[in-house]
């Protein structure tokens, strides 16, 4: 016991030293156990309270941390520091209390229960302490991160503030420096002006720089200077000064040249010191070199000048040239020397020879005798070798007579069937004509011009011409539309003795570059190939302008397969005493062509075509002719579906595609071609065995040219023509062609033609055979120009492309529609329904009214006046007829006639007399009435599709529903140029409504529909008299 007491004494002493309350044990075990239980329960309660308080504090700390993360203010940082210090104090106090509890644990004589409780307490205290340590570590790490973040933020703000201060300081220094430099520069300039002046021996352009610098300095001094501008000015001035000094310093060294490079200015090279003073001075160029070389204002001026020059040149071309003021150099036309063999021939022998050569007929005096071989026409050995090389063995009938006539210098009209060699007939004399003249000099135009109606024919003639021109050293240029003009201009500028052209593009070439591309001053030989077709297609004005610009003593030659009499009078205007040579009659199909005409229904045409293709296509190439571009494309698709590879050729195809198609067809790459009449002229294809007129030709000459594509150069050919009963009017021309060519006419074709003649006679119509040559070209007069301008203005206004700077403002399309409407407006006062326009008469009034009527009838019967008189006259006529007497002409007073005429005039002028208006107002004032608004819009003169757009049932119903106005169609349609008779009116729309706004809405909707249709028609405008050929 002594030891135990001593032991407890020591613990109590230690407790006393630590400042805690001392405990003493009682000698009784029972009392000690109760005390221990009470103490353990109190400790448990304390621990639970501590844990709950610690949990609350942790949660509050976590919330505080989240709030502190979002906040960056220093006040909250200080409060956080205070909270952290308090938490540290609490943790220290908790650690001291735990140390006291651990030292006050019970000895080994305690009960198991107490020991277990103490052990559980120690374990829980150990777990709590470890958790607290982890939390403390996390809090310390977070605090360090926060402190580091705050330090970085503060450091960044401090750096930014210092940076701003340095920038402001640098700007202030630069501003001061710039002002000082400007002052120094001014002083230097003044010193340079007062002292000796530097000079460049080779460059005088910089002498004005000091004055300019002084001026700039004064201007900048007068106004507030921007520091950056001042700095840049300073740099420029220093660079100039540096360049001046370097150039001045290098002036003493002879032959010193080297580039002076700076950061701002481009390379400046000094010249040799010793230079002739008469040479051109150099130029010091700054950075803005592009501005010196290019200016949009200068470009506009150039464009305007070029346009004015082009229009002026074109106007000059359209005007005839005064050849009396131009001195042309003489030239020789007559090269023909008749050989003795031909000179010995008598006139009878000549006539017999001409008859043997397919019946050559000659008109005109002084025509030479026909030749029999190439040698007799007087051509050079080079041409003779070329003829032999290309297989021309002997002259054809047209060549035997045409070549000596042209060689004699005479103008010629050559008429021969297709494939007879007309091209060689005018080419060989042309070569002889050109070789006799001097060679071309720079800037001179051609000597010979060949004009054709189509591009394909121009290319074919060019190809034929080049066979001979290469050996002769002559240059040939083909000028036609549809391709780039720049290449053709380049070829013409290089010079060419021969030009093969289409008329439209030739005029463009003559007008290009103010006439510097080419000219007609040296032209002495003019050829018009297919002349009739050229005039028929509307090229007469262009051809005449070109021909009128050529010297009057030229030699002009015309060739064609057909030459209607109507064209001959026109052609003789440009020929001088021509000789007409005709071979084989006028417009005859070659005898080598077997012609077949089939009367067939439209639906069976394609099957018959497939039958012909199956029979003939293996033997050679085939051309199928149609009348329209749309039909050509449609037939192409049908043939492709039937597994027949083919191509189409018409005026709507691009020129490059047309050239490639013709080349492929000539080479045999493609053996089937669907074409319009664009391929009917001058197209020479070898091995062409069949021509099918899928669409019947509409005139005789067209048939001859189509059939003439086959059976050329002595080969056998076949021509089939499909004709339907609806095309009976064309049967006469086909019968004529068959008869003239000696082919039997099919019976069904004769029957079709006779039925058509009988039908026309029964209807009282005269049958007219059309030659087809009724085309009309441009007149180039004021009327056409005005129409073209109106069309352009209408299109610009519709699309909103009108330029405000145009002198002639575009006519508003709405104003045009309004003027064409010829609108008539009326407002009528109508009586309200259910009301009477007159008061109900009483008995006394009825008697008086009856007496007044009888008196009025008697007066009218005596005087025959007014409307009642007309009724009385009609009654008298009726009574006279019933009694069987004669009817006398009623007498009508002048007043009645005048009133009727006045009413007609008022109706036309839409005029209501004042008397009627006052009567209507009085009637309206006496009775309840309403106004009815009426407006009439005349639509007779609008295009047909525009009329359909607003007169269809759906359109009228839609407009009525939209505007709540009644719309009716009245009047009769009258074609342009025909005026309505008395009592009739042109077709118009009558709009009626009790609301004026409804009438206006209906009119606006009708105007909108017509305007849309007019714009659509304008955008898809196609000329009605469009030719088959497209030549630009």
Curated annotation (Swiss-Prot):
Lipid attachment points (N-myristoyl glycine): 2
Biased composition (Basic and acidic residues): 26-49, 112-200
Motif (DEAD box): 529-532
PANTHER family associated with the record: ATP-DEPENDENT RNA HELICASE DBP3
GO molecular function list: ATP binding; ATP hydrolysis activity; RNA binding; RNA helicase activity
Known function: Component of the 17S U2 SnRNP complex of the spliceosome, a large ribonucleoprotein complex that removes introns from transcribed pre-mRNAs. The 17S U2 SnRNP complex (1) directly participates in early spliceosome assembly and (2) mediates recognition of the intron branch site during pre-mRNA splicing by promoting the selection of the pre-mRNA branch-site adenosine, the nucleophile for the first step of splicing. Within the 17S U2 SnRNP complex, DDX46 plays essential roles during assembly of pre-spliceosome and proofreading of the branch site.
Positions carrying Phosphoserine: 199, 295-296, 346, 804, 929
Location of this chain's protein in the cell: Nucleus speckle; Nucleus, Cajal body
UniProt region (Disordered), positions on chain: 1-228
Compositional bias (Acidic residues): 201-211, 219-228
Reaction(s) catalysed by this chain's protein: ATP + H2O = ADP + phosphate + H(+)
Residue spans of biased composition, Basic residues class: 1-24, 50-73, 81-103
Domain Helicase C-terminal, chain residue ranges per copy: 592-753
GO cellular component: Cajal body; nuclear speck; U2-type spliceosomal complex
Binding site for ATP: 416-423
Broad class of the protein's primary localization: nucleus
Entry similarity comment: Belongs to the DEAD box helicase family. DDX46/PRP5 subfamily.
Membrane-spanning residues: none
Phosphotyrosine PTM sites in chain numbering: 294
UniProt domain Helicase ATP-binding: residue ranges: 403-581
SMART domains: DEXDc, HELICc
Name of the molecule in the record: Probable ATP-dependent RNA helicase DDX46
Gene designation: DDX46
Motif (Q motif): 372-400
Cross-link Glycyl lysine isopeptide (Lys-Gly) (interchain with G-Cter in SUMO2) residue location(s): 186, 325, 779, 908, 916
Coiled coil: 152-197
